[in-house]
Amino acid sequence: MNDPLWKKGEYFKDNERPERGLSVARMIAHITYLSEDAMHRKFGRKLQSRDIISFGFDADFQVESYLRYQGQSFVDRFDANSYLYLTRAMDYFDNYEQFKKNIEFSHTPNEHLKYLIISFTSDWLFPSQESKIIVNQLN
């Protein structure tokens, strides 16, 4: 929303898309898709196409190159306003709160239900700790 081309979501009038802001937003969000351990295993501090650090603003590290690619490829196929609405919906979603509202209903007498709770240790949006809380409540 700080991209000057966003224009409070009215960017279609001038046919100029807020690509910089959308690209940076995607790069930041993409970091949350991998845990710190996963990022370290995948990239560490490996250099991208060079033997020494340039101390410039080009992508010295593989992780920089990867995130820039993710950001740029995203603006080619996604709309900034759509991304804002999707990320806002994710902000408001609370898996555990939804679970608590439904747990009493799902534990009616004589009901034989099986549950499968799957989590990924690399998931920052829905951490494994939250899944463990749900499993404990189901037991």
Describe the residue ranges of each PLM region.
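Short beta-strand/loop motif that positions the catalytic acidic residue
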Residues: 111, 117-119
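Short, conserved loop/helix-junction motifs that constitute active-site signature segments
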Residues: 105-112, 138-139
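Active-site nucleophile elbow and catalytic-triad environment of alpha/beta-hydrolase enzymes
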Residues: 69-70, 84-107
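Alpha/beta-hydrolase-fold enzymes
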Residues: 1-73
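Acidic catalytic loop of the alpha/beta-hydrolase fold
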Residues: 73, 121-126
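Helix-enriched interaction subdomains in cytosolic or periplasmic regions
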Residues: 72-81
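Flexible loop/turn segments at secondary-structure boundaries
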Residues: 92-94, 124-128
